[in-house]
């Protein structure tokens, strides 16, 4: 039996893992002739379902973390530039004007 199947993340499939392991240990000919295939198919289905559930949970957790990080960034930006980043908007406009003026001066020479 694969050691990764005994992991905590597949705890929901423990019954299927034990059933397949028991079938494999009973009689060797059952294993050879594929008489344990029903147990194996059930285990594969359970593992796939468990894996999908783990992926869904991970996506949800990452979205929650991302939203929290973005809230923190917005709070830091508001502390630095004021509400709705008004100061940043003004500074960006002034920077754009200066850059345009310097470009115009360079082009006129």
Curated annotation (Swiss-Prot):
Keywords: Chaperone, Copper, Disulfide bond, Membrane, Metal-binding, Mitochondrion, Mitochondrion inner membrane, Repeat. It is found in: Mitochondrion inner membrane; Mitochondrion intermembrane space. Disulfide bonds join 13-46, 23-36. The keyword rRNA-binding does not apply. The keyword Chaperone applies. Residues 10-54 form the CHCH domain. One of its GO terms (cellular component) is mitochondrial intermembrane space. A motif (Cx9C motif 1) lies at residues 13-23. Its main location: mitochondrion. It is a peripheral membrane protein. GO terms for biological process: mitochondrial cytochrome c oxidase assembly; mitochondrial respiratory chain complex assembly. A motif (Cx9C motif 2) lies at residues 36-46. One of its GO terms (molecular function) is metal ion binding. Interacts with CMC1. Present with 279 molecules/cell in log phase SD medium. The twin Cx9C motifs are involved in the recognition by the mitochondrial MIA40-ERV1 disulfide relay system and the subsequent transfer of disulfide bonds by dithiol/disulfide exchange reactions to the newly imported protein. Required for mitochondrial cytochrome c oxidase (COX) assembly and respiration. May be involved in copper trafficking and distribution to mitochondrial COX and SOD1. This is COX assembly mitochondrial protein 2. It comes from Saccharomyces cerevisiae (strain ATCC 204508 / S288c) (Baker's yeast).
